[in-house]
Amino acid sequence: MRHTTLIALLTLVIATSPLANADETCNSPYIAKLIKGQEDYVYVWTLGVEGIGDGSDKLVTVDVNPKSKRYGKVIHSVPTGSRVEAHHMGFTDDRRHLWAGGLADNRIWVFDIATDPAKPRIVQTISDLGEKSGWLGPHTYYAMPGRMLVQALSNTQDKGGRTGMALYNNKGKFIASYAMPTENGGDGYGYDLAVNPRKNVLLTSSFTGYANYMRPIGDLMKDGEAMKKFGATMAVWDLKAMKAGKVFSVPGAPLEIRWSLNPKDDWAITAAALTSKLWLIKQEGKEWVAKEVGTIGDPSKIPLPVDISITRDGKGLWVNTFMDGKTRYFDLSNPEAPKQTYEKVTGKQVNMISQSWDGKRVYITSSLLASWDKGGADNEQFLRGFAWDGKELSHRFEVDFTKQKLGRAHHMKLGSNALRTAAPKK
């Protein structure tokens, strides 16, 4: 029933209004400590489920080093004591801390992952996002030099889609807020952000607000006015001035943004969820443009692309589609014309996808949103690890998050013992 209802909802959204991170190759360019060898851990930010285990959101640590006796096993978990739709997380620029939050709340939990990478611990809870900025539902945590730029999805006044970004220092002190553009075609909505320092450009994308994303699917699809309240834009910002400039119309919900990591490239790519299209953002002359450049699966079947992961050379792109449970690989040798070269069903529902820096290991999780995940036997909740040889994804391990009473597996970040550092002296 849940699967059928979600299809109906998505079809209605397409007809009425366009709908609206993850791994070693999509971190902020200001993070210097990248794991370029074998990662030791995958940190999984996990939604709590009432009646399963402690019911709390938690950060779960899984050992993913094949040489370890604990390979593919959960070795640690840190409950927050709350259940607030745990969603995304991001490293500080020094990679000592991991910031994580939920879409149903304004709290941000700060985990120390440097003192003992195998056993993260909560060292701070930031709770003034709503009070200081007026935003609600922190989504993206993007490292800046000594700072963290947080993109929210909603606001505290009407819990709609009008939102913005908040800037903090690494100690958790609020510095400034920036509203998403509402002029020159802007709709005020937000979702992801990504920076190209060489071009002094910040890109943002758009989704919807708390009032929509927290509603049960069945209720939402019956509300015609609510269905009109989804974003369909991307914006180019002057990074240094933190001012929005050109706004692009990108139908179908542009979600995750990935800049090519090739030093010779200055383009970014995103996937539009409801139209199943790939969009390229690039500079032509002095103007930034957005182009539809590819199709993901059969758009009429609404595969729902939800997460993407770009290879370190900018030549390949992984795309996960939630509804059909498929993981696809696109050749980006010509970013103007992406070509799908591989696909595999990796779950009954799949959401986030992460890859190692060398591209040889791929990790996939299952949960989208608590009220949007499938029901019954299709509601698989897992972390699955795969090996990639350039031709085939080969299954290596699985952690069943329901069986182990952990919750719904969502966002991932990679950890390494090589990044262990002593706590700085106060």
Language model features with spans:
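Asp-box/WD-like beta-propeller blade repeats and closely related beta-sheet repeat scaffolds
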Residues: I113-P197
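Beta-propeller blade signature
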Residues: D57-D63, R162-G172, M221-K240, D378-G390
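Beta-propeller domains
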Residues: T92, N184-G190, A194-N334
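A short beta-strand motif characteristic of beta-propeller blades
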Residues: V74-T80, R121-E131, F174-E183, K243-F248, ...
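Blade-loop segments of beta-propeller domains
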Residues: Y71-T140
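Loop/turn-rich, solvent-exposed surfaces of beta-rich toroidal or solenoidal domains
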Residues: P299-L383
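Short, conserved, GDST-rich strand-edge loop motifs in beta-rich repeat architectures
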Residues: G37, Y43-D54, V150-R162, S205-K229, ...
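Beta-rich, blade/repeat-based domains predominating
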Residues: T25-K33, D54, G81-D93, E131-R147, ...
